[in-house]
Amino acid sequence: MKLDPNADEFRAAAHAAVDWIADYFQNIDSFPVLSRVQPGDIARQFATAASEEGKPYDALLTEFRDKILPGITHWNHPSFFAYFSITGSQAGVLGELLTAALNANGMLWKTSPSLTELETRALQWLRDALGLPSNLFGIINDTASVNVFLALAAAREATGLNIRGEGMTGRDLPALRVYCSEHAHSSVDKGALALGFGAKNIIKIASDEEFCMRPEALAEAIASDRANGFLPCAVVATTGTTSTAAVDPVRAIGEIAQREKCWLHVDAAYA
């Protein structure tokens, strides 16, 4: 049994959706930036139990316009100034359309060679654009929070304590410390907690009048921890904090991390 419509029905529905998207981009400033609904207004328009029968695409698009759109905050709106100062692009929308159609997984080269090789090439372009050394490489993750998590996991293993193999309990290990600005993203705390560092070992470094991490305060915290038997493990610097878009002094922080043999992660997901 085929659940999808025939090609002609799909093509007509896709054209209607693209027409709506094009009009939306062109007329987005006609919408209020913030929705004007009250809590529960959207949910009340839908049945409490899922329907056992589907609906045609044109009916779904009508429901989207009439029921969903009124409850949307328009992040692409020219007068939207909250949170992240970036908007979606038309090219990005089409790219996601093609990606959704392919429905491919790129966890290995074999699962989709094009995904792996395009990822590698795109990161080379980014590396060269930033003027970074030619021996640098990387991977693209789904969120900056995952990047922070993986960086802290790498930092934990770089201590040489083989925590991945032997765990953090049942043997005599020093407490590993993670340092970040008091304005760092919450993913630092969440990642450190998930990886077993413990809340008391997440050290928030004081900021200056520009809300940037103070390198001298970082150096003092690391020195104090070493004197008290803790093992400094990782430093997270932020370029564009969520609260104020502050940029930590990465060079000075990096010099301290290098001197103290701490893993340095730069959370460069601006805001």
Where do the model's predicted regions map?
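N-terminal entrance/gating region of PLP-dependent enzymes' catalytic architecture
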Residues: 1-135
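A generic structural motif
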Residues: 2-5, 209, 241
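A broad, structural surface signal
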Residues: 8, 12-26, 62, 66, ...
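Short, well-ordered loop/turn elements at secondary-structure boundaries
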Residues: 69, 77, 133-135, 173-175, ...
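Histidine-centered active-site/metal-ligand motif
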Residues: 83, 185, 263-265
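PLP-dependent aspartate aminotransferase-fold enzymes
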Residues: 85-99, 103-231
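Active-site-proximal loop/turn and secondary-structure-junction residues that shape catalytic pockets
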Residues: 184, 240-241, 270
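Active-site phosphate-binding strand-loop segment of PLP-dependent enzymes
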Residues: 213-266
